[in-house]
């Protein structure tokens, strides 16, 4: 079993129950899924760029990404409806815990001038969104093989009802929030 999942079941559930007085163990918020999205605007001109990005996203998450397509045409961006413009991965279960563990303990500390992630990125429903400026912070990405620095959005979806509960859950998981 994953070390983060074990920590959640053995320590975090009891401390959250104590803090927020939940009636049962099932009421304790948990992490439902993590969505990693990479928007690739250059894919409009050059489709090869997309393959490289998909490859990198697969290396980072350990799961094959789904290619996202444009919902509508936008002439200003030379974009037609149905054109591939990005890739996303939805992680659940074991892979989700593996990814979160790696993100918190290895990747985020590798960010330059890192002072912690923003406390303001909660959406009011207990979900947290995090933007990563470069894919190089992940240990699976080889610096020499990178053709272009790409960023990504990481959305952590929890079952928490409020932002306060979600913040407490993520803090105990080890998410380094700003002081």
UniProtKB/Swiss-Prot annotation:
Keywords: Ribonucleoprotein, Ribosomal protein, RNA-binding, rRNA-binding, tRNA-binding. GO terms for molecular function: rRNA binding; structural constituent of ribosome; tRNA binding. GO terms for biological process: translation. Transmembrane segments: none annotated. InterPro entries: Ribosomal_uL5 (IPR002132), Ribosomal_uL5_bac-type (IPR020930), Ribosomal_uL5_C (IPR031309), Ribosomal_uL5_CS (IPR020929), Ribosomal_uL5_dom_sf (IPR022803), Ribosomal_uL5_N (IPR031310). Gene3D superfamilies: 3.30.1440.10. It comes from the Bacteria. GO terms for cellular component: ribonucleoprotein complex; ribosome. The keyword Transmembrane helix does not apply. Pfam families: Ribosomal_L5 (PF00281), Ribosomal_L5_C (PF00673). PANTHER family: 60S RIBOSOMAL PROTEIN L11-RELATED. Part of the 50S ribosomal subunit; part of the 5S rRNA/L5/L18/L25 subcomplex. Contacts the 5S rRNA and the P site tRNA. Forms a bridge to the 30S subunit in the 70S ribosome. This is one of the proteins that bind and probably mediate the attachment of the 5S RNA into the large ribosomal subunit, where it forms part of the central protuberance. In the 70S ribosome it contacts protein S13 of the 30S subunit (bridge B1b), connecting the 2 subunits; this bridge is implicated in subunit movement. Contacts the P site tRNA; the 5S rRNA and some of its associated proteins might help stabilize positioning of ribosome-bound tRNAs. Belongs to the universal ribosomal protein uL5 family. This is Large ribosomal subunit protein uL5. It comes from Shouchella clausii (strain KSM-K16).
């Amino acid at each position: 079993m994953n070390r983060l999942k074990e920590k959640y079941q053995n320590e975090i559930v009891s401390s959250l129950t104590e803090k927020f007085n939940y009636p049962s163990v099932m009421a304790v918020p948990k992490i439902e899924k993590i969505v990693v999205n990479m928007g690739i605007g250059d894919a409009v001109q050059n489709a090869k760029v997309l393959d490289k990005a998909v490859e990198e996203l697969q290396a980072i998450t350990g799961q094959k990404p789904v290619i996202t397509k444009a919902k509508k045409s936008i002439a200003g961006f030379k974009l037609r409806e149905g054109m591939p413009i990005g890739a996303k991965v939805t992680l659940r279960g074991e892979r989700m815990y593996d990814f979160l563990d790696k993100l918190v303990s290895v990747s985020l500390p590798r960010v330059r001038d890192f002072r912690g992630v923003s406390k303001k990125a909660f959406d009011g429903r207990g979900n947290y969104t995090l933007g990563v400026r470069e894919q190089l912070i992940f240990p699976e990405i080889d610096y020499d093989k990178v053709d272009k620095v790409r960023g990504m959005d990481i959305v952590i979806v929890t079952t928490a009802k409020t932002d306060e509960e979600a913040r407490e859950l993520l803090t105990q998981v080890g998410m380094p929030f700003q002081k």
